[in-house]
């Protein structure tokens, strides 16, 4: 609080959320080639402020103002089969964000990691989740490790 009785806060300092998942063995079932599916597994909820988070990896904005937030994800993928083209993609309110995705070729037993950063405008109750897709086959994808958050 300054000498005039005004408290100045930075909204950037108040917005954060993180979920993580390590050593996951639950496969995400891929029913259709190149169709994103929400990541399967149980996430641990970390520190949150102006967001809520749950053990499915869903981050929900609870702020009173509309703001743009940077989402960051580090995802390690494994799959059955060779040379499988896998994609991670952010979905807002259950709808794919077309540009918020990145792909990598992965072979069984040789897990691959990808990082994704994307700015998303958020209003109260908007939520973001991570989805995966296999554009090579319907082989299931296991997200063995995942860090997902906002800052």
Tell where the protein language model's regions lie, with residue ranges.
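Surface-exposed loop/turn positions
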Residues: 65, 124-126
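Terminal beta-strand-rich extracellular "head" domains
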Residues: 70-123, 131-139
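Terminal (often C-terminal
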Residues: 2-82, 101-102, 117, 138-151
């Amino acid at each position: 609080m300054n000498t005039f009785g005004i408290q100045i806060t930075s909204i950037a300092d108040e917005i954060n959320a993180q979920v993580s998942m390590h050593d996951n063995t639950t496969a995400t079932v891929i029913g259709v080639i190149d169709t994103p599916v929400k990541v399967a597994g149980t996430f641990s909820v970390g520190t949150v402020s102006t967001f809520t988070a749950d053990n499915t990896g869903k981050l929900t904005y609870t702020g009173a103002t509309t703001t743009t937030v940077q989402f960051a994800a580090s995802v390690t993928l494994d799959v059955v089969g060779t040379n499988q083209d896998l994609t991670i993609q952010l979905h807002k309110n259950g709808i794919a964000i077309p540009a918020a995705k990145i792909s990598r070729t992965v072979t069984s037993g040789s897990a691959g990691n990808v990082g994704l950063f994307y700015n998303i405008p958020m209003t109260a109750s908007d939520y973001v989740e991570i989805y995966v897709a296999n554009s090579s086959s319907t082989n299931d994808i296991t997200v063995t490790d995942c860090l997902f958050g906002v800052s």
